[in-house]
UniProtKB/Swiss-Prot annotation:
UDP-N-acetyl-alpha-D-glucosamine binds at residues 95, 164-167, 308, 330. The gene is murA. GO terms for biological process: cell division; cell wall organization; peptidoglycan biosynthetic process; regulation of cell shape; UDP-N-acetylgalactosamine biosynthetic process. It is found in: Cytoplasm. The active site is at residue 119. It is an enzyme of class 2 (transferase). NCBIfam families: murA (TIGR01072), PRK09369.1 (NF006873). GO terms for cellular component: cytoplasm. One of its GO terms (molecular function) is UDP-N-acetylglucosamine 1-carboxyvinyltransferase activity. It catalyses: phosphoenolpyruvate + UDP-N-acetyl-alpha-D-glucosamine = UDP-N-acetyl-3-O-(1-carboxyvinyl)-alpha-D-glucosamine + phosphate. This is UDP-N-acetylglucosamine 1-carboxyvinyltransferase. The keyword Cell wall biogenesis/degradation applies. HAMAP family: MurA. It comes from Rickettsia conorii (strain ATCC VR-613 / Malish 7).
């Protein structure tokens, strides 16, 4: 099994280009089921993308892959979909597999999807997905670990209020509603840029969607959607990760191919800590200027601070000048990186959904183990900050969400290699 060896202590300096957003491309790929052909560009080279390709092919899709140096193009032809079951062997690898449920059900009137897998960071139940589809007229039962869904005729437009903000359920609801009969109004929706990107892609395909980027989305169902081409937006989580990498290594990095407005809340939090962050053409520049203040943080649905960046921010705060309180409001089990950071000398105490981080002068290298995607990269950031050697095990998580991570860091001076 591969591992990463990191020799820290070098400030990162240079340019990092951001890849396409994983959390946007996966639902957009699922949306291809709604039409006959979808051409997607700026597709990141990630194992989760490969898993979604395998899933779509298992349903009968034909996928042409055009490889470029930094991205894929995908041409997905779904006119011959003939299998409506998403098997456990594929779905267990990635929770995003559940996003084929809405498209299959709304277009073909039936779907059977295994209960999903992915990172072990909380329950992330499918109750809201099922509830909104039932509100559209679907008949759904869970049997033998599968969601069995069917509808008599087309799904029907509905008014639905999500009990809590759910990105995944918002996406499935939108994917189902675009071909439902009549008007669907969704309340308390996720507002994430990746949801906006999905909606913009669906509009390119001919969907009628209003309220994009707000908590209230209105969709007027169409009889069919068109072929289309669409470029996926860049990954704000990847961008934020490298912004924190620049800060924790006392570096100076230009992070390019990202719109500043979707990383502005990250930039503002870094500025609070004393890091210099300025917008530049096609990106943002992050520069350490000699101090790192302790700052409290709460994760919340967008436009709040992303839970997917909480672990990276915590790594940064382990070296801050005081005490910070980090509150995790999204997932109940997202502090699994804490014991590993403590192995490296961090002073962190977890109390329920809160972590108290007391800054130390320096972390030290150690052998550590990744528990999930975002935790793994937080340990890399910690390793880069030390003046010694860190060995990170179970790095297969990284390839699910970060394209060319070692290359991008090495190009900025990091000593990091996979063995």
């Amino acid at each position: 099994m591969h591992k990463l060896i990191i020799h820290g202590g070098t400030p990162l300096k240079g340019i990092i280009n951001i890849s396409g957003a994983k959390n946007a491309v996966l639902p957009i790929m699922a949306a291809s089921i709604l039409t006959d052909k979808l051409h997607i560009t700026n597709v990141p080279k990630l194992t989760d993308v490969s898993t979604m390709k395998d899933l779509l092919r298992s349903h009968g899709a034909d996928i042409e892959i055009i490889e470029h140096q930094d991205e894929f193009e995908l041409i997905i032809d779904t006119k011959n979909i003939n299998n409506f079951t998403a098997d456990y062997e594929i779905v267990r690898k990635m929770r995003a597999s559940i996003w084929v449920l809405g498209p299959l059900l709304t277009k073909y009137g039936k779907a059977k999807v295994s209960l999903p897998g992915g990172c072990a960071i909380g329950a992330r139940q499918v109750d809201l997905h099922i509830a909104v589809l039932k509100a559209m007229g679907a008949e759904i039962e869970i049997e033998d670990g599968y969601i069995n869904a069917s509808s008599k005729g087309r799904l029907k437009g509905t008014h639905f209020v999500f009990d809590k903000v759910s990105v995944g359920a918002t996406i499935n609801a939108i994917l189902a509603a675009v071909l439902a009969e009549g008007e669907t109004m969704l309340f308390n929706c996720g507002r994430e840029p990746e949801i906006v990107d999905l909606c913009n892609c669906l509009i390119t395909m001919g969907a009628d969607i209003a309220g994009i980027g707000t908590s209230e989305i209105t969709i007027k169902g169409k009889d069919s959607l068109n072929k289309a081409s669409y470029k996926v937006l860049s990954d704000r989580i990847e961008a934020g990760t490298y912004m924190f990498a620049a800060a924790i290594t006392k570096g100076d990095v230009k992070i390019c191919r990202i719109d500043y407005h979707i990383v502005e809340n990250i930039a503002l939090k870094l500025i609070e800590t004393g890091i210099k962050v300025v917008p530049i053409n096609n990106g943002v520049q992050v520069t350490y200027e000699g101090k790192l203040n302790s700052v409290d943080l709460e994760t919340n649905p967008y436009p709040g601070f992303a839970t997917d960046l909480q672990a990276q921010f915590m790594s940064l705060m382990t070296l801050s000048s005081g005490v910070s309180m980090i509150t995790e409001n999204i997932f109940e089990n997202r502090f699994m990186h804490v014991p590993e950071l403590c192995r490296m000398g961090a002073d962190i105490v977890v109390r329920g959904n809160k972590a108290v981080v007391r800054g130390v002068e320096m972390l030290k290298g150690a052998e550590v183990m990744a528990s999930d995607l975002r935790a793994s990269v937080s340990l890399i950031l910690a390793g880069l900050s030390t003046n010694s050697k860190t060995v990170l095990h179970r790095i297969y998580h990284l390839d699910r969400g970060f394209q060319d991570l070692e290359k991008k860091l090495s190009n900025c001076g990091a000593d990091i290699k996979r063995v």
